[in-house]
């Protein structure tokens, strides 16, 4: 735990997106207690990949080794996402967990707003720009409900992948999420 009271923890899947990590850590400095970056030793297409590692302040880095056994890419991603719980074991039930991918960078102001709603026991979607392949290739007809904010007790009950699966169902959203 980082200090007294409710802690906001930023937990995300990481695949070596160093620039995204740097932006994320800088943007959320002073807002989150710590970050949890979880890396996998396999690509989405099940190819072996070298673990990049993380050298950033306030970031707990973990590596999950899935081997070749899980061949479905979405199942592999779900297992990796659910493994984020291991990096959150020191959290209290009322702590707020941000859950997303490394490139789904929330704004500090959106995190504050989402945390207030999540503290009331709600799953909150941060509506973010949907960029396809490149940061300057923006899909303007829709927003991406990537990063989610939930209390830790809700995350344990639903699982990280369960929260991800419900991201478009929650009526609670921060419109300019990052």
PLM regions and their residue ranges:
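N-proximal low-complexity "stem/linker" segments adjacent to membrane-targeting elements
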Residues: 1-30
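Short, conserved active-site loop motifs that form the nucleotide-linked donor/cofactor pocket
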Residues: 8, 59-60, 123
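Short, solvent-exposed loop/turn segments at secondary-structure junctions
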Residues: 15-18, 41-43, 66-68, 103-105, ...
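Short amphipathic alpha-helical segments and helix-helix/interface helices
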Residues: 22-26, 85, 111-115
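Active-site-proximal specificity loops/subdomain of glycosyltransferases
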Residues: 40-99, 108-109
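Conserved catalytic core of nucleotide-sugar-dependent glycosyltransferases
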Residues: 104-177
């Amino acid at each position: 735990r980082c200090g007294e009271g409710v802690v906001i923890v930023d937990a995300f899947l990481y695949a070596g997106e160093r620039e995204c990590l740097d932006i994320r850590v800088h943007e959320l400095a002073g807002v989150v207690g710590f970050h949890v970056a979880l890396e996998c030793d396999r690509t989405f297409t099940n190819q072996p990949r070298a673990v990049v590692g993380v050298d950033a302040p306030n970031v707990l880095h973990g590596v999950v080794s899935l081997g070749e056994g899980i061949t479905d890419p979405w199942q592999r991603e779900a297992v990796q996402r659910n493994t984020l719980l291991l990096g959150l074991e020191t959290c209290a039930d009322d702590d707020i967990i941000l859950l997303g991918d490394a490139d789904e960078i929330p704004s500090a102001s959106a995190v504050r707003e989402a945390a207030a709603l999540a503290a009331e026991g709600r799953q909150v979607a941060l509506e973010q720009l949907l960029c396809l392949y490149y940061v300057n290739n923006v899909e303007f007809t829709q927003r991406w409900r990537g990063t989610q904010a939930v209390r830790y007790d809700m995350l344990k009950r639903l699982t990280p992948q369960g929260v991800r699966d419900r991201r478009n169902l929650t009526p609670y959203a921060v419109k300019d999420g990052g």
